[in-house]
């Protein structure tokens, strides 16, 4: 695990500039919000997520997270059909603060186009980008 400005940036993930991460697992993509995002939002109290079977589109909103500070759109890092929604996050949204990269994942999708990964950051680029965030 790499730390940049007190933010965890795990290796092996892709990152979007909308503060979401993607982990490729057996041709599927697991999606969640980054440590930076959860720290900016502070105490997350609600997550509105789409349903299994729905399709999300890269760079388009697919849900929201609500904190004591703000309501923020979730922006899809990839296009694909939703295979699984993390109901634990809907029941216990604090998981997004406590464990954003493991228990706090949001969606598991079947990506429509793996080439879209080229338009988001790999780990090395993400580390450099996180250095510019405050």
Regions found by a protein language model. Give the residues of each.
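Charged, well-structured alpha/beta interaction segments
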Residues: 57-73
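Acidic, low-complexity mobile loops and tails
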Residues: 1-61, 94, 98-114, 119-134
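Histidine- and aromatic-rich ligand-binding microenvironments
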Residues: 73-77, 110
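Conserved "cap/hinge" positions at secondary-structure junctions
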Residues: 60, 66, 86-87, 111
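ATP/adenylate-binding site constellation spanning eukaryotic-like Ser/Thr protein kinases
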Residues: 76-79, 123
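Charged, amphipathic alpha-helical coiled-coil/dimerization segments
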Residues: 79, 83-84, 90-97
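Residue-level recognition of beta-strand microenvironments
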Residues: 22-24, 68, 85-88
């Amino acid at each position: 695990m790499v730390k940049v400005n007190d933010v965890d940036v795990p290796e092996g993930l892709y990152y979007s500039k909308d503060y979401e991460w993607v982990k490729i697992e057996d041709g599927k993509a697991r999606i969640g919000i980054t440590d930076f995002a959860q720290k900016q939002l502070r105490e997350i109290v609600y997550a509105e997520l789409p349903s299994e079977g729905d399709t999300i589109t890269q760079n388009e909103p697919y849900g929201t997270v609500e904190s004591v500070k703000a309501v923020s759109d979730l922006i899809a890092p990839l296009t694909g059909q939703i295979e699984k929604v993390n109901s634990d996050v809907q029941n216990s949204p604090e998981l997004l603060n406590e464990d954003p990269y493991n228990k706090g994942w949001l969606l598991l999708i079947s990506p429509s186009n793996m080439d879209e990964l080229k338009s988001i950051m790999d780990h090395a680029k993400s580390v450099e980008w996180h250095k510019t965030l405050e």
